[in-house]
Amino acid sequence: MGSSEVSIIPGLQKEEKVAVERRRLHVLKALKKLHIEADEAPVVAVLGSGGGLRAHIACLGVLSEMKEQGLLDAVTYLAGVSGSTWAISSLYTNDGDMEALEADLRHRFSRQEWDLAKSLQKTIQAARSENYSLTDFWAYMVISKQTRELPESHLSNMKKPVEEGTLPYPIFAAIDNDLQPSWQEAKAQETWFEFTPHHAGFPALGAYVSITHFGSKFKKGRLVRTHPERDLSFLRGLWGSALGNAEVNRNYIFDQLRNLLTLRGDVWRRTVANAKYIGRRIFAPLLRLQQSLQRERPVLEDEGGEPNYNWLTEMLENWTRTSLEKQEQPDEDPESKGSVSDFLDFVRKTSICASKWEWGTTHNFLYKHGGIRDKTMSSRRHLHLVDAGLAINTPFPLVLPPTREVHLILSFDFSAGDPFETIRATTDYCRRHKIPFPHVEEAKLDLWSKAPASCYILKGETGPVVMHFPLFNTDACGDDIEAWSDTYDTFKLADTYTLDVVRPLLALAKMNVRENKKKILREMRNAAMLYYPKHYAQSCSLV
């Protein structure tokens, strides 16, 4: 159990310092195996961008090949956004066993089954929380279907290999959605939020809470009410809550809600106790719910929501078209985990959250904290945390602070569209906050984006060297980049991902690492020789 107090400490947290120091010993051994002599271990960070299932699968391929080539053992930090967080977290739940991880991936995508009943149980349970939001629904009903897994472990379970230094230190990115206006206007550093096996918090403020108490209620820096640590399924939903734009996400959610009332009898029996004649028992309450939401429409609009009740009308119409036999499935499982009232409460809460478009609601651990001068941060009772890809689709802002002393960044970009948009956005962010980052002329980025190669090496006068690896590139894809992009579109549902679709993407991601191994080793060797923060002789260049 972590500390029950809020920590306001500039720089690295104590647990991270200890873990990183232990990791240095393993990195030095790994460098020696790679024939790189170093008195001090350079800090290498690997970044994985967002990109839904495409990023999930490609990031697994990158990690697997880096392990195979002996490169992963020389890495200090692993950081991810959105779909890459699903891959990175899987590395730790499998204790770093890449063979087991790939076997699990093949198993998951060799079958079409998805345990809807279990996912629905988890969602109904989550709806009992006062802070239930669309993130809960998204995590258990959408992301679990996309990835075909529902992990129940926790971030704190990852501590052992991290503290022993046997695996890199993981950082999972999110942003504070309430600060989006500040981000749009000034790229406010406070927007970024991070999760590690030890803590969750705002690195720009040095404000953290133990990961075991993330979601618990705090006031004036003291624990007021303890809530259970959120499981990895929920966090994956939070980190990956922007697979598409608002319209795409809305359609995902409404489609799932529409389908709930046409569930098979066995699903009802596994999720709702005393499910006999459930149709007759829930139709009237759902009808009242629809009428209630219509009455509340002006209130919800005042709160900035965009009410849309068509899905609920369709739910009711679907139900009336369902045969009586299906509506009145008998209850054969008295051990079911929910009740009809639980189900109705879940639908009611989801309806309200959908109307208000409320995501990522959690208690603000900085509420009324006297050590925070910014009242915007301490006056709110709740935070609303969402996918960091809505700001920058890769976690550069979390590894660039000088306290982490990163010397070399391997940026694997699995984004849709322009693979240099993350470089542009990070350049703008760093310019505004005077953070060292290689500058690249816009004309050069435009040229590169038309026919991207597999690796770009960016160097500035100070700060880390950045190696940027576009997933779809001319070296691997030739003239077929557009075809590859269409095949692995971010918005494609998991149903379209068969093993025949997964294997080529996994192989492509591995090849990008393998074909650039010499360049990676060269930059690792340079980092070991030119220990940060010594100046690099070259200006930004392509190697």
Model-derived regions: residue spans:
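Patatin-like phospholipase A catalytic core
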Residues: 71, 93-95, 101-405, 450, ...
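Helix-rich "cap/lid" substructures immediately adjacent to catalytic or cofactor-binding pockets
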Residues: 24-78, 109
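Acidic, Ser/Thr-rich peripheral helices and adjacent loops at domain boundaries
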Residues: 95-111, 342-345, 420-463, 471
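N-terminal charged/capping segments associated with class I S-adenosyl-L-methionine
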Residues: 1-44, 48, 93, 100
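Conserved acidic residues
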Residues: 45, 76, 169, 406-407
